[in-house]
Amino acid sequence: MSKQSLSYKDAGVDINAGNALVDRIKPHVKRTTRPEVIGGLGGFGALCALPTKYKEPVLVSGTDGVGTKLRLAIDLNKHDTIGIDLVAMCVNDLVVQGAEPLFFLDYYATGKLDVDVATDVVAGIAEGCVQSGCALIGGETAEMPGMYHAGDYDLGGFCVGVVERAKIIDGSKVKTGDALIALGSSGPHSNGYSLIRKVIEVAGVNPATEQLAGRPLADQVLAPTKIYVKSVLELIEHVDVHAIAHLTGGGFWENIPRVLPEDVKVVINENSWEWQPVFKWLQEQGNITRHEMYRTFNCGVGMVIALPQADAEKALQVLKAAGENAWLIGQVEPLNAGEEQVIIR
């Protein structure tokens, strides 16, 4: 008896589906191109030149995912904005150091490739790249039978940016008296989703049908992470920014100290902005303490910027002209023995 001739497809890997995906995403990728990009998709490595305007360029890199927000997106069958989240988590980490994002790569892994779903995801990644001005120059689509449950996939993002060495923002210029400006978030962004999913479970609600402030809860918890790149780069052109903190995992308590010298603290007035309804709902339904809210969520603030008090009003004008919700929320003060570096009152 002759043996059956096996193929890669028999093992669960469909190369034709992968090729179909590449064809489907090409128009989306094309939207993101920059003049520095050399060549197109399909090479073994993606090529990108440095912009010529930099005298002493320093490369800044970052990698991130979207956590269990992806689980919620899969469960609610909404795949078109999770790619924006993926880009946002990477490029926002770059711009806080003054860097302009140059290029982005993605990793998409699944048990069985669904070309329609993957196209939606990559279209979102491309949209995030357009919003941040960086080029989507490559990626990896891994079809791995037996590694994921049916319908599941995972994402990773990788970004490289560039900053003039003399203009790196590292927090070293922060000093007592500096003003703190907050940039409004679009919602929980991409952090705290294991707790969000737990609260939804305990509350016993369906996010697709549960209404909150006139909108489905699903729309509010899956709102794409705000990309601040263009607004922040515009701000840097107009004022002397001393530090920027991207409020991600760890919230206020852990992210703001990352950009502070050891001898100062920040004092924040929590009445200077208002939590969006989704945060109030989460706190109420989950009976979450105030401290835990500020540790897990951004509570309506995506970034905190420290700059000279004399520049605060100008900074607010620049940011609002760029389309941001921005508020003066506090100031930098000397750190006394035994104090925490972040005080919210």
UniProtKB/Swiss-Prot annotation:
PANTHER family: TRIFUNCTIONAL PURINE BIOSYNTHETIC PROTEIN ADENOSINE-3 (PTHR10520:SF12), TRIFUNCTIONAL PURINE BIOSYNTHETIC PROTEIN ADENOSINE-3-RELATED (PTHR10520). It is an enzyme of class 6 (ligase). One of its GO terms (cellular component) is cytosol. This is Phosphoribosylformylglycinamidine cyclo-ligase. HAMAP family: AIRS. InterPro entries: PurM-like_C_dom, PurM-like_C_sf, PurM-like_N, PurM-like_N_sf, PurM_cligase. Pathway: Purine metabolism; IMP biosynthesis via de novo pathway; 5-amino-1-(5-phospho-D-ribosyl)imidazole from N(2)-formyl-N(1)-(5-phospho-D-ribosyl)glycinamide: step 2/2.
